[in-house]
Amino acid sequence: MPSSHLFKNRSFVLYLVLRVFLSLSVTSLAVAVGWHIYEATGDAMDLAFIGLTQIVPIWALFLVSGWVVDNAPRRRVLQMTIVVQMLTYCALAWVLRDGVQDVSWIYLLLLINSCARAFVGPSIQSILPGLVSKAELSQAVSVASTVWTTATTVGPFVAGYLLHWFDVNVYWIIASLMLVAFIAVTLLNEPAMVKKAQREWRDVVQGIVFVWRNPLVFPSMAIDLFAVMMGSVMVLLPIYAMDILQVGPEGLGYMRAIDRKSVV
């Protein structure tokens, strides 16, 4: 049972709000954009390209994002990435106002969105230890993880109904969710940065060699990588929702949410 004192910590509560609305916006985007593109083109490869635009930037920028988070104010990094994502949601609403005319614009906006998201994970994870005491850290991590998992489950379910009710205007709603996240991170009391020794590329290479040669770490990471790659088949769910089950966007939202229910 989490300590009640933990929820009296204003910064920690704002941190939870930040994580909730970031998760809701990201999962809602996945439901909405997959539905709209497949509804317009009927091509499974277009869904595959959505997956690529979401994962390639995160893989390509993982070293850069880590360096930036280590050397820049994390709240400022989060603010900038949230603004970029919010602008891409508004741009998607504008591009799709008359339906899908050119998917290349959608892919470009998703690529920009994913480049910004590559900096969110390292920033949001590294900011938590500075918001709570060492004695409360384990509880704070547990609560934050549970809240995030719940939000990623509820997000697709709610997004399906929002998509059914508002169609392409759902992207304005997703942008408003990101606006709440921006307000939360702006009100957050950022912990003081700890001065760290400058890292060199030699340190990166040593880390990779360590992972490769460690008989416990490498297999564990490989299994996790394989599971994540197989999880990418979720982008194909619009095919099942639209062509096979014919359940509509609300059904698609439920299908994307149902695999997370057991985790919660």
Residue map of PLM features:
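Alpha-helical transmembrane-bundle signature of multi-pass membrane transport and export proteins
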Residues: 1-264
